[in-house]
Every structure is written in structure tokens, then in C-alpha cells.
């Protein structure tokens, strides 16, 4: 039963159990006051929806329940994801890029370009280190990685250094185009990464020579600039496992979740938020 607002007692909020009232009970003492309903919405309580769960598993949830992602406060999941992205991934990712570029610059200007002499003439013998297939796999993966890196950097950091220069219209079109490049090049990266792993994994298993290489700092310690190793030295093996294979698998997997290509994942917002945080963090690590 509704009630005229002018007939409502001014001290309705002082009644016992006022804070625990349902929306129907509140309407009897304060018509038009939908606070109980909106309080439940803000707490992530699932409401009624006529859509089947199989088609819209979150149709009854306007605001996600409270969670705490690494680096966020206890708040609703959408806000927690925003805090992790804007307060951790973006600023610390940009700082990591700056540190790496600075280190590369210092190394280049102190050591100079590192090249190799290729003697020519009678008696010169060349040894094939990589087959044409291995080179093709490498460059296919490298092309895909560069395209994904450029498009990812623009989407994540572009508003800080491109938007002020290009303006919102051009930057919007550029981001839209690169987002499509990101989506279509992603499968090429996934396939070429699998080929790279299967092709080179046998030569990247640790052995005793790797400990010798590490003990001499790859030739920087002890004066021996050519430390013996097998096909790949310990540094190259570390890059293969911790710079390519392991993070690459998680980047590809999280990307497939974001594209909703893995059955059972990506149907709810929390899946997308977690996948996005993993994807961004490890992609920055790989770059």
C-alpha cells in the first residue's frame, strides 16, 4: 500500500529495524525511498532478470561485489580493477620502459655498437647456425610481437604522449585501427610462439656449461670474453624461458580470454578484469 508523503511521520527513520527494511517495507513508511534496493545494488546483490544465466550470467548484477585485487583497496571489482590499472600497471610500466631505454642508451654510448667481424677469403668456413625454417619462424614471431607491442603501447599509454599532439579525433581513429591490428595479429603471434617453443626447446635445457657461463658473468668476469657454451648460452636460455616462453603462454592465454575464445572463461566481468591485469603486466615484462 502506498502512502501520501505528507502523511508520513517525520521520525520514520527512528523506527526499530529501519535500516534492515526491504524496499517494500520502506515504501510503507517513506514512499519513493528506494534506498534498500540501491544499497543492495551497490553491494553486488544479484537481482531478478528474465534473461537466462547461460546467455547473460551477470544480468542481475549492475555493480560487482566487493573484492581486493593486488594493489587495490577493498571495493567493488570494477573500481578495484581501475585502481590496479591506473595506479600500478600504467605508472610502473611506464617507469620500467624508461629505465630500460636509459640502460640501453648508457650501454650503447659506453660500449658502442657490438658487431662481429666476418672474415672472407680462401679457407673461410661458414657454419649454418639457424636453418631457413628457424629464421622464418623467428621473423614471423618478431613481426607479430612488434605489431602487438606498438598497438599495445598506444592503447595503454597513447593518451599521455599522442593525444595532446594528435587531438581526440585522430587519436580515436588511430586507437580503433590499432585495436583491430592487435586482435588480428594476436593469433599469428600465438601460432608462431608455439612453433618457436617446439623448435628451440631442446636446445634450451640447462646443463653444466651454463653454470660455468654464469660464474664468469658471460665473459664479463675473469677476462675470458668467449666463454664456451652449447648452441645457446645461459643468458639466452634465461631469455627463452623467462622472457619468451612462460610469459608468452600467459599473455596468449589471457588474450584469448579477453577475446572470449576459451569456453567457460570471459563470460563475466571478473574473468576479463583478471585476464586484463595478467595480459598487461606480462606484456610489459616481455617488451
Cite the ranges covered by each PLM segment:
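Membrane-embedded alpha-helical bundles that constitute the cytochrome b-like, heme-associated redox core
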Residues: 1-287
Amino acid at each position: 500500500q502506498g502512502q501520501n508523503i505528507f502523511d508520513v511521520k517525520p521520525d520514520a527513520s527512528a523506527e526499530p529495524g529501519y535500516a534492515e527494511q526491504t524496499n517494500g517495507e520502506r515504501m510503507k513508511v517513506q514512499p519513493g525511498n528506494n534506498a534498500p534496493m540501491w544499497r543492495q545494488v551497490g553491494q553486488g546483490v544479484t537481482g531478478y532478470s528474465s534473461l537466462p544465466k547461460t546467455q547473460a550470467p551477470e544480468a542481475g548484477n549492475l555493480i560487482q561485489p566487493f573484492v581486493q585485487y593486488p594493489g587495490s583497496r577493498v571495493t567493488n571489482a570494477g573500481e578495484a580493477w581501475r585502481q590496479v590499472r591506473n595506479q600500478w600497471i600504467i605508472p610502473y610500466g611506464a617507469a620500467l620502459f624508461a629505465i630500460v631505454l636509459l640502460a640501453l642508451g648508457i650501454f650503447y654510448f659506453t660500449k658502442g655498437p657490438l658487431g662481429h667481424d666476418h672474415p672472407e677469403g680462401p679457407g673461410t668456413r661458414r657454419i649454418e647456425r639457424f636453418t631457413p625454417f628457424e629464421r622464418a619462424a623467428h621473423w614471423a614471431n618478431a613481426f607479430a610481437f612488434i605489431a602487438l607491442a606498438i598497438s599495445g603501447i598506444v592503447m595503454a599509454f597513447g593518451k599521455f604522449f599522442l593525444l595532446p599532439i594528435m587531438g581526440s579525433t585522430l587519436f580515436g581513429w588511430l586507437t580503433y585501427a590499432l585495436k583491430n591490428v592487435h586482435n588480428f595479429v594476436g593469433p599469428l603471434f600465438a601460432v608462431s610462439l608455439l612453433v618457436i617453443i617446439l623448435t628451440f626447446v631442446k636446445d634450451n635445457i640447462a646443463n653444466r656449461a651454463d653454470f660455468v657461463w654464469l660464474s664468469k658473468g658471460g665473459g664479463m668476469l675473469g677476462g675470458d670474453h668467449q666463454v664456451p657454451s652449447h648452441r645457446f648460452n645461459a643468458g639466452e636460455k634465461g631469455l627463452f624461458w623467462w622472457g619468451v616462453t612462460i610469459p608468452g603462454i600467459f599473455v596468449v592465454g589471457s588474450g584469448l580470454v579477453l577475446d572470449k575464445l576459451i569456453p567457460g572463461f570471459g563470460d563475466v566481468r571478473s574473468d576479463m578484469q583478471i585476464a586484463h591485469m595478467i595480459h598487461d603486466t606480462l606484456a610489459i615484462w616481455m617488451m
